[in-house]
Amino acid sequence: MVAATTLEAVDIMGLMKLLPHRYPFLMIDRIIDIDGDDSAIGIKNVTINEPHFQGHFPEQPVMPGVLIVEAMAQTAGAICIRSLGASKPSLVYFLTIDNAKFRKPVVPGDQLKIHVKKIKKRGNLLKFACEALVDGTKAAEAEISAMMVTGD
């Protein structure tokens, strides 16, 4: 049985309605689960066609860690904006990265499963615990904080 607070998955078209990011900086392809405004699981399919692989590194392409963290932040941002509803234009500003650890290289062909869980909220400030997994193995983790700004 699905919990009453669980919302349906969000495909790429839905993400483009929620997030202001576009190619080449939209770092998530879909969200497969959102539990209210508390947690989400995002998916990033890593492909060799992404522009950062031209220079990082041409002979041994590895997804830059900062882009993995950005994928975490975008997944968290989708939770925040989705929780406000479509009637309030809003942005989510990325504020801090704490305790970031990169445990396994992420390479073209990998699928990142990004788990984001809200651990603190005070007014419009939020903190999230994040993990990025490849085939069930932790590739990266971080705590991030963000600020929601509504159009009110």
From Swiss-Prot:
Keywords: Cytoplasm, Lipid A biosynthesis, Lipid biosynthesis, Lipid metabolism, Lyase. CDD domains: FabZ. HAMAP family: FabZ. It catalyses: a (3R)-hydroxyacyl-[ACP] = a (2E)-enoyl-[ACP] + H2O. Its EC number is 4.2.1.59. It comes from the Bacteria. Involved in unsaturated fatty acids biosynthesis. Catalyzes the dehydration of short chain beta-hydroxyacyl-ACPs and long chain saturated and unsaturated beta-hydroxyacyl-ACPs. Belongs to the thioester dehydratase family. FabZ subfamily. GO terms for molecular function: (3R)-hydroxyacyl-[acyl-carrier-protein] dehydratase activity. This is 3-hydroxyacyl-[acyl-carrier-protein] dehydratase FabZ. One of its GO terms (biological process) is lipid A biosynthetic process. Its main location: cytoplasm. The gene is fabZ. The active site is at residue 56. One of its GO terms (cellular component) is cytoplasm. The keyword Lyase applies. It is found in: Cytoplasm.
